[in-house]
Amino acid sequence: MAIKQNGRAHLSSDIDFIRTPEAPVDSLSTGKNPGVPSTNSPAIKNAPLPADGPGYEQWSNGFLVAALLGIPQWLSWKLGGGLKTAIFLSIFTTIPVLAVIWTVMSRYSPRINHDVKLPGRPVEFYLTFKSDSHRARWTGTHKIPMATFFELYFTGQVDLNGDALEVFEYRHDWATFNFTSETFRYILFTFFPDVVLHLRSQDEEQVRTNYDSGNDHYAWFLGPRMIYTSGIISDPTREETLEEMQDNKLAIVCEKISLKEGDTLLDIGCGWGTLAKFASLNYGAKVTGVTLARNQVQWGNDGLQQAGIPEEQSRLLCCDYRDIPEDQKFNKITQLEMAEHVGVRRLTGFFRQCYDMLENDGSMYVQVSGFRKAWQYEDFIWGLFLNKYIFPGADASTPLSYYVGCLESAGFEVKSVDTIGVHYSGTLWRWYRNWLGNADKVKAKYGVRWFRIWEIFLAYSTIGSRQGSATCYQIVVVKNLNSNHRIDGVYSQYGLHGALAAAKAAGKNMLPK
């Protein structure tokens, strides 16, 4: 796959950025009330059918544990054995029992609620299969497992009857979210080994395979800011541009850590260096950005140079986070959606490394994606899709409590947390439209399969982050030391300031006499 332009990585001057296209018209709408109130904000893709699927409410951890322990015990009893025999048999029964229970529960559990009324259209209204066997198997009310659909769509064996995002808005009408045999094979032989190992060589290969796909590839949906993290909506009553949303986010990051002139800032997983440039120009910070992707470093350092920022002030380095000298101290540290690539097993150690590199009076901004505890089976199917096709090796998307626990175990104190899932949905909606607008270029260079994988990723992620399947957290932490002057942090507790300002503006900030 070519990633070079005239012998070097693509730089901003090589890219013809487009203006984000208008959103496609919903041609699948029933025109009927879905059964629940809907939104009408121009800032996001509003949901026409926000249905809940089966999930945690029908799940029983007690039943699972009983089956895992009881079946080998029962087999041992039938064979005339004892506890040691049961333990030995459990080696062979654990995975089959897990597979059977997850398959049955994901296939036959009812929806959490039926507040949203599904249109009840046949599968063929939404999908056109290329083979007779597929048409015969998935027709009428016989829905296709979503995991199966992915591979059929990417290999051209099925087409969507409309815009991908719109068809996915009605996915409960044509798809199920049950686990398949292929799902378990992937979990067992790819996902779990990645989670357990997370070797340095493995991380390097996965990151470079992903983020060194080609700067042009990312430019075709990220736009001129080249930021692969969520932007921020400042006004839900209008459709801000992608660039406005990303500038909003960059300003918020800098303000939340009270960045000031002369501060040394370490940006771990710096991407194409846009935050480094923003912080250098607007705040006079001295920024060191690190990433494993060579193309990102070339793009970012070129951007710093074009902006007139001397290398002595700010620069990007191509290195592993584990190679950052721990004896070097920084006033501030930022990491935007990088921790997911560290792995759940290594998070606390990674945060401790950050702790050791941070000045005692410094602060760290952590932006991480997460999943809800009140899960639905769809969330798992979507998460595995991300791991398989988009972010190989990224397994650290967890509920908020896990991140907080890791940060506190590393010695930090949480100063603030904001949930920005709906902002991510708005960002992804714009990325999706950019991707469609560059469809011909993508297909010509990377092929139809590649285009379709990212088409579904961006479309489905727009929905997932809007409905809560996944979200994103902005967490600001400081060192939990007695000598920390916490009063200085009051100035940047913007959640408190915003709430109080709203009350004052409404004249509701005092108890009436």
From Swiss-Prot:
Annotated metabolic or biological route of this protein: Lipid metabolism; sphingolipid metabolism
Keyword Translocase: no
One of the record's GO cellular component terms: membrane
EC number: 2.1.1.317
One of the protein's GO biological processes: sphingolipid metabolic process
Lipid metabolism keyword on record: yes
SUPFAM superfamilies: S-adenosyl-L-methionine-dependent methyltransferases (SSF53335)
Residues the entry annotates as binding S-adenosyl-L-methionine: 228-229, 265-273, 291-296, 321-322
Disruption outcome: In contrast to the knockout of its paralog MT2, has no effect on methylation of GluCers and exhibits no growth defects. However, a double-knockout with its paralog MT2 is not viable.
Keywords on record: Lipid biosynthesis, Lipid metabolism, Membrane, Methyltransferase, S-adenosyl-L-methionine, Sphingolipid metabolism, Transferase, Transmembrane, Transmembrane helix
Gene3D superfamilies membership: Vaccinia Virus protein VP39 (3.40.50.150)
Catalytic activity of the protein: a (4E,8E)-4-sphinga-4,8-dienine ceramide + S-adenosyl-L-methionine = a 9-methyl-(4E,8E)-sphinga-4,8-dienine ceramide + S-adenosyl-L-homocysteine + H(+)
Membrane-traversing stretches: 63-83, 85-105
Topology of this chain in the membrane: Multi-pass membrane protein
Chief site of localization: membrane
A GO term, aspect molecular function: methyltransferase activity
Function: Catalyzes methylation of the sphingoid base component of glucosylceramides (GluCers) at the C9-position. Sphingolipid C9-methylation requires 4,8-desaturated ceramides as substrates. Glucosylceramides play important roles in the growth, differentiation and pathogenicity. The methyl group at the C9-position distinguishes fungal glucosylceramides from those of plants and animals, and may thus play a role in host-pathogen interactions enabling the host to recognize the fungal attack and initiate specific defense responses.
Protein name: Sphingolipid C9-methyltransferase 1
Organism in which the protein naturally occurs: Gibberella zeae (strain ATCC MYA-4620 / CBS 123657 / FGSC 9075 / NRRL 31084 / PH-1)
